[in-house]
Amino acid sequence: MDMREVYVVAGSFVGFQLFFSCVSPVLSSNFTQGYGKLPPNKLNDWNSRLVSTVHALIVGLFCLYILWYDDAVNEDPVWGDPNLVKLNVAITCGYLFYDLLLLACNWSTMGDVFFVCHHLAALYAYGYVLTRGVLPYFANFRLISELSTPFVNQRWFFEALAYPRTHQLVVANGIAMAVVFFLVRIAVMPPYWAKVFGIIYSPTFEKLGLAIQVAWIISCVCLDILNIIWMYKIARGCYKVITGKLKGRKADSKKTTCVNNHTD
């Protein structure tokens, strides 16, 4: 691994930690009235999710830029120049280390086995990208999934502030979350795996070596299984929110009808 990537990983780790400890509390208290009323355990969760949103926007938008404009990576997905991809992956690795430390320090209130599995699988695969510079296209492609994170976090923010599930903002965010999550984590699976199988049955795959082959395929399978599980949970939640909204409208309609038909 080049020293540039080491510095970026370390800087990312420290930067996100400072954002969690110093920046998020100030921003949240100034722009959100309900922030100061949250219990300590929810304050930590709030700050961590704001950091998560910032990371997702940085990495997700950088990922799209690389997909659109980095011809070297797009033309050679296995051995293309990984310069920009390694920078993006290094930012993500720093964030993942920060988040794992945060989960370990607050396991009783924030611990989640799925997130730990997700982070470890990602670090395992991204380690080869940083050290060997291989598979830049596929590493960057996986980061598209981060674009769904802001909507997931926003749902939690609404719940923490006690917004009713039938509130228009909650419903709109829930629908947007389900749609974006499906597009960037589920709908991309067929083209991604089509590209993967195109590489597997070529001499290029053999040149990678067994260790990289295993790291690449197993981590992708694990991440996609987790994404399918999360998609199922999100779809169920979105369905409940939409049906709850419809039931609320029907109830209001019945009340209005009863009032209009009332005679003294």
Curated annotation (Swiss-Prot):
Coiled coil: none annotated. The keyword Transmembrane helix applies. GO terms for cellular component: endoplasmic reticulum; membrane. Residues 41-243 form the TLC domain. PROSITE patterns: TLC (PS50922). It holds the Pfam family TRAM_LAG1_CLN8. GO terms for biological process: lipid homeostasis. It is found in: Membrane. The gene is tlcd4b. Belongs to the TLCD4 family. It is a multi-pass membrane protein. InterPro entries: TLC-dom, TLCD. Keywords: Membrane, Transmembrane, Transmembrane helix. This is TLC domain-containing protein 4-B. The chain crosses the membrane at residues 6-26, 50-70, 84-104, 110-130, 169-189, 210-230.
